[in-house]
Amino acid sequence: MPGTSGISRRALFAGSAAGGAAALLPTGTATAAPMAGGGARVKAQAKAKSTTAEASYRAGYHFTVPDQWKNDPQRPVWIDGEYRYYYLYNADYFDGVVGTAWRLATTTDLVSFTDRGVAVPKDTTVNGDLWSGSAVVDTGNTAGFGAGAVVVIVTMSPGGGTDHQEQFLYYSTDGGLTFGNYGTDPVLPNPGVADFRDPKVIRDEDRGRWVMALAENDKVGFYHSDDLKAWTYAGGFVHDGIGVLECPDLFRITAGDGTVKWVLGVSANGKGAGLPNTYAYWTGSFDGSAFTADASDPQWLDHGWDWYAAVTFEKRDADGAVDATARYAIGWVNDWDYADTTPTIDCDGFNGTDSIVREVTLDRASDNTYYLASQPVAALGSYVSRTVDLGDVTVDGTKVLDYTGISYEVTTEIAWSELTGAGLQLRRSPNGGRHIDAGIYADYAFLNRRNTVNADTSGTWQESHTPFDPSAGTVKLRILVDRTSVEMFVDDGRYVHTSQAFPYLLDTRLALFTIGGSAVFRNTVIREFSV
């Protein structure tokens, strides 16, 4: 992955705790410093992990791996009234052994998930473990495994290295619960390049064939197939300056005004250029072989530090009908620069948390360009266990609220006439010295984790920014706070920031603040969830 500073990509991609630095956060004292240690200590503490909720850093309402390690989400597919969500899983993480399989979880509402175990196992052939790819439901039996068979095209690296990536096929005839391999030969051999991975396959109904988008360093290659077994190169889209492109995404979506756009997305590392390290995307057109972008520079679906390997997938109603005006998205809340620092390693025996599933729509901006807006999936509202309605709160300086919590959502609309900045102090310590800051300042919105324990021990990636027009005099914020993550949605999801943060479990206060003036925090509501 980009940004690994020379560390073996395979070791990172496969997720091994050995040699990783895990942050152990004290739960009963505010003065003890975070501890770090090597793989042996991590393994021992994982086996003796706490079973009490008070000592747990497992997310309250976000998807987490049951044990060991997860990284890249794989695009969910809809089968028999539920989404089948696969993700990369390493059962040998705490033993220091690399290599991922595809584990499966199922869900009907994208909030509550049921673990189904490993669906596509690793190391069952000479080709070793499985990397990222995509699953499709072959309703037309184009591959010959039967109508409705689930076909996975996945990257593997025969020989155990990282420099010979090829695409292989697995298939399922039981609805995607278990898979077998289609031999040991690749369905798309490597043409002699280093980066050749993460196949994303879609059905091109207009042309009656399958299309694959493949990550090839600074290019996304496009391939055609009639049967998912034989692939032909068709063209490519090239963009440099944001690291090695990974986990491509390709879909069509209709805006509220009826405009239809194709979207090409990639996971990318823009840190070196002062850009995010998340999901970059372009709107444009696709003729089945070539993608033409509306603008050369990408937009970003998330501007925080920790929303990587994200996938989007179809939004369906209860009857399975596809909504052409929206999609869902989910991302891995971590970053390869500090993938082994979460306190869940020590406290809970796992490393792997996802973002909330988001509903993504195509909206038109005031300059007549188009962008993707995001909101938490609506079904989250069905799990509300407590609501605290604070109404309108006037603030001039800092106001500590009469509320304590670790895992919650807070929404508010900040309004002012003259102001420099305003926002919220999340997971504030009893003495006010530690907190996560979220809000606006001058001409940008921000999420800042500097004043609490967090994954970035280098101190470099602490505050994320997105543009903001202060003359608006108002801003809507919707913020999801959980035990190790914060997601901030600005102005109905025009911009989103997702970052890891590991506050002490006794840091439960919430405060509102203003800088250079007063403001009214309108319709301020806190919701807690039971999932």
Model regions and ranges:
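N-terminal secretory signal peptides
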Residues: 1-7, 18-25
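N-terminal export leaders
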Residues: 8-13
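C-terminal region of N-terminal signal peptides and the immediate post-cleavage residues
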Residues: 23-44
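Beta-rich carbohydrate-recognition and catalytic domains
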Residues: 37-199, 203-246, 254-303, 321-324, ...
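Beta-rich accessory regions
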Residues: 288-291, 301-308, 316-531
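Early-domain small/polar-rich strand-loop-helix modules and first-structured segments
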Residues: 312
